[in-house]
Amino acid sequence: MIHVAFVCLGNICRSPMAEAIMRQRLQERGISDIKVHSRGTGRWNLGEPPHNGTQKILQKYHIPYDGMVSELFEPDDDFDYIIAMDQSNVDNIKQINPNLQGQLFKLLEFSNMEESDVPDPYYTNNFEGVFEMVQSSCDNLIDYIVKDANLKER
């Protein structure tokens, strides 16, 4: 089983949105060898469900997010692929776990966009724009992991 973790600051906006989108795309593509997680590098929202803006955009596109609560990225977390939303997240991840074993990327490395960081809709309130960025990157990320880990699609 391959473990992928999306990481943002509070684990209530971007990373749970990415987790939910990725789970749905994996299911649609018939890929069952990838388990998706999300984490935050900050402690403010531990145990809380996704932000209302994240919930609304996921509901709009009929993407389930049941049972999701904010979790902290820990030094002993063991993920094969760690997908950060921005450079600050990358820096925090490396500080939390300087001996990181998994592959670390920024999500937009898998997009065709000029931007390198997914902006935090907690501050911008642009949940629709973030949804589009995340969704457009997930299929390319899946393609990369399937090839890199030599997985099969149905």
UniProtKB/Swiss-Prot annotation:
It catalyses: O-phospho-L-tyrosyl-[protein] + H2O = L-tyrosyl-[protein] + phosphate. Pfam families: LMWPc. Keywords: Hydrolase, Protein phosphatase. Its EC number is 3.1.3.48. The active site is at C8 (nucleophile), R14, D120 (proton donor). Dephosphorylates the phosphotyrosine-containing proteins. This is Low molecular weight protein-tyrosine-phosphatase PtpA. The lineage of its organism: Bacteria, Bacillati, Bacillota, Bacilli, Bacillales. The gene is ptpA.
